[in-house]
Amino acid sequence: MERRFSPRIEVNLDVDVLLADGQVFTLPGIDLSYMGVSFNCNYWTLQQIFPDGNWSGPRDKVNFTLSIKLNDEFTLDCDSTVTRFLRLSEDEYHIGVQFLGLDDETQHDLIHFVNGAGK
């Protein structure tokens, strides 16, 4: 049984990943929680997100900004850090990130969205 601080919901949302060099990638969101989001990407995009082309664990800090339009009233814009990385196939990778520095109002809106399963 998975024990989590916050529920995780499956989503079908675009996640805009904004890198420090100005590149923006729109990737399909897989799931969302109070704490973070996960998405999949191909090998080429992975090479852009990870400076060394791979992620070796939490000590390997990889941060970027996210923008996720959750609905017409709420777009989540925040900094994030990679917390999970999984190779799914030769050209597909799963990346999990944790949100950083959410203010109280944004955190409240996110909790409301997740608890309402995005409705």
Kindly label every feature range from the protein language model.
Residues 1-119:
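Structured alpha-helical
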